Each structure stands twice: as structure tokens, then as C-alpha cells.
Design a protein with these regions (language model features):
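Terminal, non-globular segments
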Residues: 1-174
Length: 174
């Protein structure tokens, strides 16, 4: 019996708990958190079946919005849009590369920060100037890349231990 959904639920809840406890990167009135929940979604989108990726993106977005104080659906929309893009590109991306999850984490972090800023500005009367977003983004982009690589490595290991995935053959056989 595969434990896909229980393992995903555990990873999402653990990521939510850790993301809540970690400090924010402040830039004036703006604060960005370490993107642990989007990193879990990126793992499922890049490495697992499509239904698991969609489910992970949806719930990572719901939890991100609930913990971050942005209008419900904002991060879910952003993560689902990113998931569809990465699903379309997945057949062209190398499987065993660490660069792909790192780049995806950085791209998704920037996309979500810009989307959340736009929604807060349009729907909630948030009036912080756009340039205040640059300093936190300069910090969060490399941090998101590293966090995503770490989360993907941990998620691969957990799924392997749970019997959800098979070991990779990353070295060509003679």
C-alpha cells in the first residue's frame, strides 16, 4: 500500500509548522517568510504524478494564505499556475538535476511575492510602495533556492523510506 497522501499531509503540516516558527525577512512594511510550503508543492509537481502535484499545490497555497494573512486563494492560484507551467515543462527538464528545483523555488518565491503584493494592494488597500519589495526579494531568492533544494532532498528521502518511490539510477551502468 502506497502512503502518498499521508506522507504528503505530514510534509505539508511539518512545513507549515516550521514556516510559522521561522522569522520573516522584513523590508519596511513588507515581510516575506521562508517558502517551505511552496517547496513541498514544487517537489510534488516536479517529481511525482500530476494529481499529487495539483493536490500539493492547492493545499500548500491554502496553508500559505492562512499563515500569511493574504486573501484566501491568492497563493493557491499562484502555485496552481506555477504547477501547470512546470507540468508542461517537465518532459524537457533533466530528472536528477539539483538546479531545476533550486531555480523553480526561486522563480515561485518571486512570483508568489509579486502576486501577494498585487492582491494586497488591489483588494486590501495595502499602500506600501513597490520598491520596498526589492530588498526582501534579494534575500528570499537565494534563500528560496537553498530551501527548495533541502526540502526536495528531504521529501525524496521520506518518500523512498515510505515506499512511495523507487531509488534513482543516477549513475549509468557499464
Amino acid at each position: 500500500m502506497k502512503l502518498d497522501f499521508p506522507v504528503m499531509l505530514a510534509m505539508l503540516l511539518l512545513a507549515a509548522a516550521i514556516q510559522t516558527l521561522l522569522p520573516s525577512f522584513h523590508g519596511g512594511e513588507l515581510a516575506l517568510k521562508a517558502p517551505l510550503l511552496p517547496s513541498v508543492a514544487i517537489y510534488y509537481v516536479l517529481e511525482r504524478q500530476r494529481p499529487l502535484g495539483i493536490f500539493a499545490a492547492l493545499w500548500a497555497g491554502i496553508l500559505t494564505d492562512a499563515l500569511g494573512g493574504v486573501p484566501p486563494g491568492t497563493s493557491s492560484f499562484g502555485l496552481l499556475a506555477a504547477a501547470l507551467l512546470f507540468f508542461a515543462l517537465r518532459k524537457f527538464l533533466p530528472e536528477a538535476s539539483w538546479l531545476i528545483p533550486a531555480a523553480a523555488g526561486a522563480i515561485v518565491a518571486v512570483f508568489l511575492a509579486l502576486l501577494q503584493y498585487a492582491v494586497l494592494r488591489a483588494r486590501c488597500g495595502f499602500d506600501a510602495p513597490f520598491y520596498l519589495l526589492f530588498r526582501p526579494l534579494l534575500v528570499i531568492v537565494p534563500f528560496a533556492a537553498v530551501v527548495t533544494m533541502a526540502v526536495v532532498a528531504a521529501a525524496r528521502r521520506i518518500d523512498l523510506m515510505a515506499g512511495n518511490t523507487e531509488p534513482r539510477k543516477e549513475v549509468a551502468e557499464p
